[in-house]
Swiss-Prot record:
The lineage of its organism: Bacteria, Pseudomonadati, Pseudomonadota, Alphaproteobacteria, Rhodospirillales. Keywords: Electron transport, Heme, Iron, Metal-binding, Photosynthesis, Transport. Pfam families: Cytochrom_C. Cytochrome c2 is found mainly in purple, non-sulfur, photosynthetic bacteria where it functions as the electron donor to the oxidized bacteriochlorophyll in the photophosphorylation pathway. However, it may also have a role in the respiratory chain and is found in some non-photosynthetic bacteria. InterPro entries: Cyt_c-like_dom (IPR009056), Cyt_c-like_dom_sf (IPR036909), Cyt_c_1A/1B (IPR002327). GO terms for biological process: photosynthesis. GO terms for molecular function: electron transfer activity; heme binding; metal ion binding. This is Cytochrome c2 iso-1. Binds 1 heme c group covalently per subunit.
Amino acid sequence: ADAPTAFNQCKACHSIEAGKNGVGPSLSGAYGRKVGLAPNYKYSAAHLASGMTIDEAMLTNYLANPKATIPGNKMGASFGGLKKPEDVKAVIEYLKTVK
């Protein structure tokens, strides 16, 4: 699937290539796994302690407001969230296809 335009904001820090971390972890295969499992990426203590699974419910909240969803995480410090619900939905649907 082609990435939605809203994913351009994600690409500033995240790769979709397995094992290729940037400022943020690779998003390859992220959908459906527990937070904090991308190999060779140093997660914040907040992310590791969250115990969350990266699924539709989590991403709906997290992509709109990362700071409130996982207080103290790195992403929330620099990214305020996607403002349009349709952008959040488009990015979630795209992440479901990124293996």
